[in-house]
């Protein structure tokens, strides 16, 4: 059994894409957040209704999602003089290496770098981080490990929406085993959930919009 598992692992496609060695200073333009290893991560911005926003929100999406997840809320925030930023994390949305897991250290390093760039762009405006599901987990881990940078980040607060807090260490062995085998044997498999015959929401307009979103 062990031998067969090793063979399967050897034949499986790569599932990880870690942070490369730093080659440049992180930067931010209208379309991309460019990381320290030169990776271009797409970024969206919803400007506040007034020239000077009363607050800034950096939104971090969840697993199998991307930066547009915050669109409805960001439009509301904009009308209330709040500017919102959101970016596609590595492996998600239009970011490079879609489908590959970048690793916790890489995702948190990206978040901290982008937070510092936004803080530098808006030095006197209250800055908040907003994370949904996996995005909430990325924020929590990043801030836990960022004691030395905490003052430079200058955060006014954190907003967590259904943060992902159930890690593998709390899962029974059969779940972690199934996840590992599936990820290393069928890394490109797509799970749609269609066979479950469950309606995700009674908001038909929202479901249609999601269906049309590439």
Each language-model region and where it sits:
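Short beta-strand element of the alpha/beta-hydrolase
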Residues: 53-62
């Amino acid at each position: 059994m062990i031998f067969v598992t090793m063979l399967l692992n050897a034949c499986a496609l790569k599932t990880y894409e870690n942070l490369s060695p730093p080659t440049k200073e992180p930067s931010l333009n209208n379309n991309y957040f460019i990381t320290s290893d030169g990776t271009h991560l797409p970024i969206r911005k919803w400007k506040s209704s007034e020239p000077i926003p009363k607050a800034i929100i950096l939104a971090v999406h969840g697993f199998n999602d991307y930066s547009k997840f915050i669109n409805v809320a960001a439009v509301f925030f904009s009308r209330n003089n709040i500017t919102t930023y959101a970016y596609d994390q590595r492996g998600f949305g239009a970011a490079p290496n879609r489908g590959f897991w970048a690793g916790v250290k890489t995702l948190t390093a990206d978040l901290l770098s982008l937070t510092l760039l936004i803080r530098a762009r808006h030095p006197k405006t209250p800055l908040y981080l907003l994370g949904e599901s996996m995005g909430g987990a990325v924020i929590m881990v990043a801030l836990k490990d960022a004691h030395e940078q905490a003052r430079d980040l200058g955060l006014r607060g954190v907003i967590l929406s259904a943060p992902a807090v159930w890690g593998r260490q709390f899962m029974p062995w059969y779940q972690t085993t199934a996840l590992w085998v599936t990820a290393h044997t069928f890394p490109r498999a797509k799970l749609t959930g269609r066979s479950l015959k469950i309606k995700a929401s009674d908001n038909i307009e929202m479901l249609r919009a999601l269906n049309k979103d590439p």
